Amino acid sequence: MIKPGDVISYLEMCTDEGVNLQRGMNFHLRGDVSVILMSLRPNAPYADRVEEDGHVLIYEGHDVSKTQDTPIPKIVDQPMNNPGGTLTQNGLFYKAAKEYSSRKKHPELVKVYEKLHAGIWVYNGIFKIIDAWQHTMSLLSMAPV
């Protein structure tokens, strides 16, 4: 059994979860268990962070996929809904947080793994999803003087 703080391989992580983890957000992956894969490494694609001595995690969510129509996913709002209207992973986690904050449900539990290096992860434990928000990032273009 993997315990918080254990450093494990990608294969061990997938074996423990019983699935081949491919995306960062996995809402109710198996039953009521959700899984988040995060990275705090330099040049990580998302601005995930840890606050309050490891008691609070801020997870940025999923960008849209890079396509010919969206060559720079960071300039497109992270979608809450799929084209067919169902909730995306962003939408599912957001809804769960809002249902908790409005006292409609207990907080969702999420297992968090943090990428240390290619193929090497640390299990950070189980966290409660207690809040979610959307915020606008501005992209600044600078030209040399």
Label each residue range with its predicted role.
Residues 1-122:
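Acidic, glycine-rich low-complexity segments with interspersed aromatic residues
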Residues 116-145:
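Compact mixed alphabeta submodule
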